[in-house]
């Protein structure tokens, strides 16, 4: 069955409700996913908040979808590797998927727990996964958004700025951790606001909504050790993204 999985869900249940009925953004994502055709959700959480999360979020979702839980533990890395002393930051989205491999039995989507995507995004990704067989062509997909539609009047956001070709194929994603409205447009800074780089409003950006067939699991298992080999030598704060 098609599986949908929610990333970084650990403390989202503490977020402020967005309507008068006490719903949080994740409620809307699950509702939209169900409408699009997804049947199962796997929440990636921390062990220590498991009971609270199930009480505040999981039980509500169980009425509508098949719910499972997985745990992103930074110690869950390939044999022969050690977590750097003092590291508490998770290893990133790819590691979140690595942590729930046993729950994945078909094509699946990956989302952030606290971003709003809209029902059309779930329909697009579900339709793609439903019509593309798992083969050696890497039938993976990402839902992109126009940058101007993803910024806020209240501070800055982090977005993956995408490069695509004329066929709509993704060439690269460059993370910009501080993007905001600036001088009548949108710009990013990498030096705490000393200099700004303007970005066209219609630039395609990633909000970390991905669709994969099961073949990505073997790619993650094969690539994660290489990521650790390179990253641990250079920077103990690295994270492995999809």
Regions found by a protein language model. Give the residues of each.
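Alpha-helix/helix-capping structural signal
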Residues: 48, 148, 214-215
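A C-terminal functional module that forms or caps the active site or interfaces directly
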Residues: 221-242
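Short beta-strand segments
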Residues: 68-70, 110-112, 139-146
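Conserved nucleotide-sugar donor-binding
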Residues: 209-219
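Conserved core of the sugar-phosphate nucleotidyltransferase
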Residues: 119-209
């Amino acid at each position: 069955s098609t599986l949908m999985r929610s990333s970084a869900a650990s403390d989202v249940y503490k977020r402020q409700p967005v309507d008068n009925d006490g719903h949080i953004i994740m409620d809307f994502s699950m509702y939209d996913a169900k409408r699009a055709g997804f049947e199962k959700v796997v929440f990636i959480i921390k062990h220590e908040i498991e009971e609270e999360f199930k009480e505040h979020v999981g039980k509500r979702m169980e009425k509508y979808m098949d719910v499972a839980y997985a745990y992103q533990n930074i110690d869950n890395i390939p044999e022969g590797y050690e977590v750097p002393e003092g590291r508490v930051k998770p290893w990133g989205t790819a590691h979140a998927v690595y942590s729930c491999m046993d729950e994945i039995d078909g094509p699946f989507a990956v989302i952030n727990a606290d971003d709003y995507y809209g029902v059309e995004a779930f329909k697009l990704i579900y339709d793609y996964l439903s019509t593309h067989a798992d083969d050696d062509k890497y039938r993976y997909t990402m839902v992109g958004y126009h940058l101007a539609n993803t910024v806020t009047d209240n501070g800055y956001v982090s977005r993956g700025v995408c490069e695509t070709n004329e066929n709509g194929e993704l060439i690269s994603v460059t993370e910009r951790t501080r993007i905001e409205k600036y001088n009548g447009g949108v710009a990013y800074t990498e030096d705490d606001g000393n200099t700004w780089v303007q970005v066209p409003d219609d630039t395609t950006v990633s909000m970390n909504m991905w669709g994969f067939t099961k073949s990505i699991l073997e790619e993650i298992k094969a690539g994660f050790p290489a990521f650790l080999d390179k990253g641990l030598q250079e920077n103990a704060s690295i994270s492995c993204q999809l």
